[in-house]
Amino acid sequence: MKRILLVLAALFIGLGSVSAKKRKEVKSDLVGVWQQAGTVDGKLQARPILKIIDADGTFSTMFVYSGNTSGRMTQLGTYKIMNDSIYKETITNHFIRSQEGMTVPIKYRFADDGKEVLILEFENGAGKAVFREMWLRISAKGIAK
């Protein structure tokens, strides 16, 4: 399963790089491939959701179906880092069409010194609920060049 996720992540990063317009490169610890995680019975468990934050200022989120290699893009957009704890995502494409065009300020912090665990907090569009997400960096260590 992890191998499939790494291959899919590499594929989408490569496709994004080829098709992306020339943009100013973003230098940030946010850049990378992230897998959503949560706790189940007190244990950390990865979920089949990937977020790719690219250095060209774009991001994408996808759901990977269990048991096969297909998946579904759930959202695409751009992001802008406001400061060392807030960035904004602007959603350009979303599987829920009413989300398209929204700009969402997101609080972020790293839960560890190695910057491998990312915590995101944001409000829903109506401002009535705060969502908190945990993301684990997918490492490319050990992959031969």
Annotate each language-model stretch with its function:
Residues 1-4:
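Positively charged n-region of N-terminal signal peptides that target proteins for export
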Residues 11-12:
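Repetitive helical segments and hydrophobic/amphipathic motifs
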